[in-house]
Each structure stands twice: as C-alpha cells, then as structure tokens.
Curated annotation (Swiss-Prot):
Present with 5080 molecules/cell in log phase SD medium. This is Intermediate cleaving peptidase 55. It is found in: Nucleus; Mitochondrion inner membrane. Aminopeptidase which cleaves preprotein intermediates that carry destabilizing N-ter amino acid residues after the mitochondrial processing peptidase (MPP) cleavage site and is thus critical for stabilization of the mitochondrial proteome. It catalyses: The enzyme cleaves the 36-Pro-Pro-37 bond of cysteine desulfurase (EC 2.8.1.7) removing three amino acid residues (Tyr-Ser-Pro) from the N-terminus after cleavage by mitochondrial processing peptidase. Belongs to the peptidase M24B family. It comes from Saccharomyces cerevisiae (strain ATCC 204508 / S288c). Gene3D superfamilies: Creatinase/methionine aminopeptidase superfamily, Creatinase/prolidase N-terminal domain. Its cofactor is Mn(2+). It holds the Pfam family Peptidase_M24. GO terms for cellular component: mitochondrial inner membrane; mitochondrion; nucleus. The keyword Manganese applies. Binds 2 manganese ions per subunit.
Length: 511
C-alpha cells in the first residue's frame, strides 16, 4: 500500500517529476509537429498530457476535464456523507465476446466521473472518517505494473501512477482487495455500495465486494460483525451530481454534438445502397471528425425496419421509395451525443413522407421551446405536452378517422432522456422533477405507422424520429446538435446539391 505524502496535484508538474525518473529531461523528446514528434516513454494506461498533448491539455486528466474538477466532484459527494462512512465503487473488467476476442473497454461511469480513471479491474473507495472534508481519503486499488502483461496488453499506470497522476491519497494492488477492504469497512459505520448494481454485475471485483457485505462468501472472515453496519446504495446520490453538467462538460458535449451533426450532413449528401454502408460511413465520420467512438450501437433502419425502435441489425438493402431512420452519434472524452434523423433514400420527399415528417418536426420544435428552467417543466411534463401535440398532428393528417387508432400505438416511446457519460444519463434521475440549468436532455418525438389496412397505404411502413440534444438554461436553451439539418428544404438542398462547407477530416485536436 502507498500513502500520499505530497499535497494533491492539480497540474501535470508532479507527474513530470515522477516520470523524470524514466526520462530526463522530458523536453528533449518534444517536437512542434505531430508527424515528427518522438514518443515520450511514459508508461501509463491511458492518454496523458505528456503522451498526447494534442488531446489532453496541461492540468487535465481526461479530454476537457481537469484534475481539479475531478477532485471537486469527490468533495461534493463527501459533503453529503456522514462521518465514519465510505463509498465503494467497483470498476468494470474487460469483457470477452468469444474466446480471446474482447470488446472495447468501457469503464463503470460513476467511478470514471469521480476519478477520470479509465483502466480495467479497479476499485475506488472514498472514505470520510470525520466531519472535516480535509480528512477525506481517496483510495484506489488498481492492477500493479507487470512487465510481461504490459508487453502483451499495453502499459498500466500502476499503484504509484494512480497517486501521482490521478491524485489518489492511498493506493494498493487490486490483488490485495480481500485484505485491504475489510480494514476500511471495519473502521466505518456507513457503507455505500450498490448491492443490486445493473451496470457491472459480472465484474469480479463487484462480486467479491458484494459477497463480503452480504456474507454469501468466505471472504468476510476478516470482517468484524457486519450486522452493526448500515449499507446503503450510492448510485442515485451520484446521479444527482451527474445530471447537472459543468461548463467544461457542456463544452465537450457541444463539440461531440457538432461533430456528429456535421457527420449526418455528410451522409445526407450521399446515396447509399445498404444500411451497413451508411452505418460504417457515419462511424468513420464521427471518428475522423474528432470523436473517440460511437456513443452507442447505431440504428440504421430503412423502410419497415424503422418500425422497430431499437433496430440494430443494419444489414438490409435500401430502396429509393423508402425513408431511412438513423439514430447514431459520437462520444468524446466519455460524453455522448445522441441524434436521430429520418430522410428519403431518393433524395426527395414524397407528399406523404413530407406530411408525416412535418408532423413529427412540428412536435419537436414546440417541445424544444419548453426546455427552459424558468418554465418549471419536468421531462414528464414535456412528454405529456408531446402527446397532446402529436394527437393534434395526427388529426390534421386524418389518422384520427382510422378505427382503433391511438397515439400511444403510433408514438410508443418517451419524449427523451438525460444525456451525459451514459446515453441514458442516468436512469435513476427522476423524470418528474423540474428541469434545472445545466441538465442535458434529448427531445425525440416519433411516429411509426404499421403495415395495417386500416391506415392509408401511402403512410404505411414508415417510421420517423427526429432527435436533438438540448442543454437547459434559465430563460433559454442550447441545441447541442444544431448542425444536423432537419428542415425539409435544407435536407433536400443538401441531398440534391451537396454541401458547400468542408468537413474537417482526421482531426487530432477536437477540443
């Protein structure tokens, strides 16, 4: 176990002192150009300013978010805790698709939100022994340095690096979890841990901690009686912090939305013959424009496939008499964008397509206008308003004359959700509380007309969804995805005439 002696670091200077043991001086390795820059031999498990100066600015731990902001998040959480308490968060493990084929790593987002740590097989503990916030202890248990493993899997920051880079007060090898954790639990009265976690129930560390706390395994022998401990969930408490975005978070999300929106415009200007090609095109544009990856598995649904809300097969042929519904966006620095657009494969709306599309767009426009804190609307209030608006639009189209119709059948999903590190950020946040300044929500009404004889033939097998990301202000709002065109005249102009603005390819410094 290592214990921090030096004060908490909010710049990369102490990181440089640490790594000067490996390289001296660091400056001799730096270059003014990306192409000629010599790699600095710093052994860390994720990008740092020293290794990726074009991606991470000095003082930042992750793109756009400083070490100071991560520290402030931990302190805000500690302020809500009683003395003699600890929060335990189990990070995610590498997940395998088949045999040795693994999925890209995705960190448990509560742990990431509080630490910026993006390496697998780790546990974070935030301990508050007294009333004084200055006594708060930030523990990290992480994979130790291992030359053999790092040769095959990549560098690790290690037990020392998690202190010097990520400001952990105390750190230890994750291999010592069974000895380390009982000591902390024994000396605290309140244990905050999500026993019923749905985010990482397969994590080996989660299972170990759970068995320690519920007595289901043999790992609790080193514990004093757990019966006199109060065990409470923590994710809902963290969710209340996560739902209000800082200016830095909003800046990242605005950039992710901008890149994603411009990528959609690039797609509008091309004709595609199959869903997988359009899927791949958008993926390339998100990454080339500066995002890290897709924010989620995209929906690329042509024709009747669009009637499935979360269709992700993306393997069908696209015909000119159909529309395609795409729900896709990029992620930057861990923060998601979320965009849905629907457009005709032919490049021009038919009269029926135009009428249905305008109905959805009218509802979306009116709902976005409600996204101000001063209106005192909740997300549920906006949803109820969208139902009323959609009923009127359907009546205008004559669909109210269809026997047995109801708006819930044709518009079966919710108007939107919170957005952030998770694409649904975070489910535990109430839909019924008034929206607050700094929240980011999606507004995404939709219409899905089934292939049933009771509906006019020209409307059947058409699914339309239009979605944007909206940041709540006091008396205004900001559309974070405004670049993605959606007005019919604008769409047809791009589809038929292309784009006049150049898309910035192969971005290395998105922020």
């Amino acid at each position: 176990m290592l214990h921090r002696i030096n004060p908490v670091r909010f710049s990369m200077q102490s990181c440089q002192r640490y790594f000067s043991k490996l390289v001296s001086p660091l400056e001799q390795h730096k270059s003014n150009t990306f192409t000629n820059r010599v790699r600095i031999p710093i052994e860390a498990g994720q990008p740092l300013h020293e290794t990726r100066p074009f991606l991470i600015k000095s003082g930042e731990l992750t793109p756009g978010i400083s070490a100071l902001e991560y520290y402030e998040r931990r302190i805000r959480l500690a302020e809500t805790l009683p003395p003699k308490s600890c929060v335990i968060l189990a990070g995610n493990d590498i997940q395998f698709a088949s045999g040795a084929v693994f999925y890209p790593f995705q960190q448990e987002n509560d742990l990431f939100y509080l630490s910026g740590w993006n390496e697998p097989n780790s546990v974070m503990i935030l301990e508050k022994p007294t009333d004084s916030l200055s006594d708060t202890i930030f523990h990290m248990l992480v994979p130790p340095k291992d030359a053999f493993a790092e040769k095959w899997e990549g560098f690790r920051s290690g037990v020392y690096g998690v202190q010097e880079i990520f400001n952990a007060d105390e750190s230890a090898s994750i291999n010592d979890l069974s000895k380390y954790l009982p000591k902390i639990i024994n000396r605290n009265d309140f244990i905050y841990f999500d026993m019923l976690s749905t985010s990482n129930p397969s994590s080996s560390n989660f299972k170990h901690i759970k068995s320690l706390l519920d007595g289901s395994g043999n790992s609790n022998r080193s514990l004093n009686s757990i019966a006199n401990k109060t065990i409470k969930p923590i994710s809902k408490r963290i969710a209340e912090f996560r739902k209000i975005k800082s200016p830095q978070e909003l800046r990242i999300m605005r950039r992710a939305g901008q890149i994603s929106g411009r990528s959609f415009n690039q797609a509008f200007a091309k004709r595609f013959r199959n869903e997988r090609t359009l899927d791949s095109f958008l993926h390339y544009k998100f990454i080339s424009g500066g995002c890290d990856k897709d924010a989620y598995i995209p929906v690329v649904a042509t024709g009747s496939n669009s009637l499935c809300i979360h269709y992700t097969r993306n393997d069908d042929v696209m015909f000119d008499d159909e529309m395609v519904l795409v729900d896709a966006a990029g992620s930057l620095g861990g923060y998601c964008a979320d965009i849905s657009r629907t457009w005709p494969n032919s490049g021009k709306f038919t009269d029926a397509q135009r009428d249905l599309y305008e109905a959805v767009l009218n509802v979306q426009r009116d709902c976005i206008k409600l996204c101000k804190a001063s209106n005192n609307y909740s997300l549920h209030d906006i949803h109820e308003k969208s139902i009323t608006l959609m009923k009127q639009e359907l009546k205008n189209l004559g669909i109210d004359k269809v026997s047995g119709w109801n708006v819930e059948k044709l518009y079966p999903h919710y108007i939107g959700h919170n957005l952030g590190l998770d694409v649904h950020d975070v489910p535990k946040v109430s839909r019924y509380e008034p929206l607050k300044v700094g929240q980011v929500i999606t507004i995404e009404p939709g219409l899905y007309i089934p292939n049933e004889e009771s509906f006019p033939s020209y409307f059947r097998n058409v699914g339309i969804r239009i979605e944007d990301d909206i940041a709540i202000g006091e008396d205004t709002y900001t559309n974070l995805t405004v670049e993605a065109v959606k007005e019919i005249d604008d769409l047809e102009n791009v589809m038929q005439n292309g784009l006049s603005t150049k898309f910035e390819e192969d971005q290395v410094a998105p922020l």
